[in-house]
Structures are given as structure tokens and as C-alpha cells.
Amino acid sequence: MKQFIRTLVLALIITLVTAPVGAQSLYNAAGMGLPVEAIDGRARALGNLGIGLFGSGLLPGDPAAAGMFIVPTAIIVGQPSWVDYDHGSGNSGSIQGSRFPLMGVGYPGFSGIFTLSLSSFLDQHYKSQRSLELDLRGEKSEVTDLFEQDGSIGSLNFGYSRPIGTSAALGFSFGRYAGSILRQLERDFSTLSFPGALESYQTSSRWTYSGSSLTGGMAANLGTFARVAASVTWSGDLNATASDDTPGMDRSFSLPMQYRLGTSIVLAPGLMITASAIRADWADIERDLDTPTTVGSTSNIGVGVELSRANIFGLALPLRFGYRTGKLPFSLGTGVATERIFSAGLGLSLSQADDIVLGGVDAAIERGRRSGSVLTEAFWRATISLRVSGY
């Protein structure tokens, strides 16, 4: 029975005939899901990967940035998306969903600033169904298989950053992974017409995730025209603990080191460019997966430009444009799936003092495409973040 369930789930993942649900990508079905970057609207609009940007920031991937602007700060980020997909089997459709990938606060202390953030890490939610014919009681009968996987993994991060001199900062954060996943499988026999039709078969399983991470980073301003930043994240094994009524063993998954590098350069007053990169090798996790999945390393890069001279009613209204490209760590079918995104956005300063933004809204709109051997997605994604600073 256990092998039957595993085979049935695998068939549903491969078939991937998906109904519109609250998911943001069908690549959530591959491996451990789709990584979610914990970045704000400004970084999204600039195609930035969350490191090396001028200005205050509470981005988990750039722990030193908070130390460059030591005042109480809070941020919240919301993100809806709309996805059109096309599967190689001929199935196509649309899905949509929303999430809050980042919430964080920072408060000064001990000549630096302490930070606390809750961020998304891996999104695993999707729903699929398929119809097939079975030979029951000597006649062909249609049944429906329904599979839903509801879950995600987030990270609670506690960090500290402090300036080094007047133009640099060091920072670190300790993270605790947490989350759960519920898998539900149902074979629906309700369409059968003969007497004494079979009752629908249902089964479910649940795992709870836990793990730890440690991120360290540095940031430095080169005069007033450039910033460079780098960070490294180490993660221990991600442990999945099965519930008491789940037929299966506890699992453990190897997570990769993540390396980030970013820079911002002011070319002229009101004109800034930015570039960033991130690399992580997920190959070691392949042996921990129980379903065939193409696993690879991710090498993502992003570039962008910000025009900050625009204003409305005396308040800054910077315009931003960006582009990013890279690979997904988990793919359906053979070959590694890729992702490329064009982005644009703007910021609105609600309060500022001496050119320092104390309160503002950053918005971004992205048009992207994910392409693999059996699945292609075209999507729109919006990101809105609210940031407030000051005593």
C-alpha cells in the first residue's frame, strides 16, 4: 500500500493537471519546493537579490546593511502573483496566490542594532488532479485522483550588526527554520454508476520541519559613490518529523551553503546602478529526496538602475528598473529549469529628514518566465513593502 501511494503521488506530480488554487508556481511540486527570496519592493524593482543596496535595510541576506543606519526600523512585505502555465502533456491553465515573504524590525543597542525578522524560505503548496479509466467489475469506469500538498518553510532570524568606523559594518544572524507540510490524497469513485459503488479512498500525512542557519556579512561604502557587500549562509540539515499517524519515517535534508555578493554605484546625482549575485549548490540534497527530481546548483545574477531625482509634492519618487536571471534548484522532468525576470517599480517617501527616508512605500511589478523540459510558466508578480524608521 505504501508503495502504491508513493507511485500514485509521483504520477500526479508528473501529470500535473492543476486546478486554480492559492499557489504561486507549479515548480512548488519539484523536490523541496520553490525558494522564496526575502527581499523588499525596492530590491525587486531593481532586479537585486537582496544585498549591496544603498539605504537602510532589514534584508536577511544582507545582515550588515542594518548597521549602516542605526535607528529603529520596521518593514513588512506583501506579494501577490498571477501565473499562466503550459505543461508538456498538453495541459495549461492559470493559478494565483499571495504571501508575505518578509516582516522585520530593528532596534539599536550596544553601539549597533539588533534585528528580528520572519521570512519565507521554501514554498511547497500546490494541488493537482487527474482523471483515468479503470477496469472495475468487468467494465471501464472513470475515477478521479486528487492530490493536495499544503505547506511551506520559513525562517525566524535574530541578528546583530554594528558599524566599523564610519564607512563599514559587520553583521550576523542566527536563523531557525520552521514549517510543516500536509499531503492529502483522494481517489474519487463518485462517478461510478453501478450499484454498490466504491467509497472514495483517502489518506494523508504530515511532517513538521526544523533546522538552523547562521549568516555573516559585511558592507562598506567607498566614499559616497559606491557600496559593496558580501554574505555567507551556513545551514544545518533540515529535519522533517512525521506525525504519529503518518506512515513514514522521519527525514533529513542537506541544505547548501549560500554565497551572496552585491554592489551599488552612483554614476551621477540621481543615477545609481546595482548588481548582485547568489550561488548555492543543492546537489547533496538529491539523495535525500524520495521522488525523481532534477537537482542542480543555482547561480543567479541581477542588475538594475534607479533614477531618484523625480518627486511629487516635494517628496522623493524614485523610478527603478531591473533584470535578473538564474536557475531553479529543483526541476520537473529532465534538465535544469531557468528563470528570467524583467522588473520596474517606484518608491514613495512618506516622511524624510535631511534626505533620509523615515517612512516610505516601495512597489515593484515583475514579468517573468520559468522554463523547464516539461513545464513553462509566464507570470506577473507584484511586491509592495512598507518601511518606517525613527524614534
Where do the language-model regions lie?
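Transmembrane beta-barrel wall of Gram-negative outer-membrane proteins
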Residues: S94-W234
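A structural signal for the main folded, soluble domain(s) of proteins
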Residues: P72, D188-L192, Q202, V266, ...
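N-terminal, post-signal peptide beta-strand-biased segments of exported outer-membrane/organellar beta-barrel
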Residues: P20-L122, G335
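Bacterial N-terminal signal peptides that target proteins for export
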Residues: M1-V9
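Outer membrane beta-barrel transmembrane domains
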Residues: D40, A45, T208, S212, ...
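Bacterial N-terminal signal peptides
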Residues: L8-V17
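Flexible, solvent-exposed coil segments and beta strand-coil junctions
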Residues: E37-A43, P80-D86, L132-E142, F189-S200, ...
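An N-terminal domain-start capping segment
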Residues: A23-A30, K140-F147, I265-G270
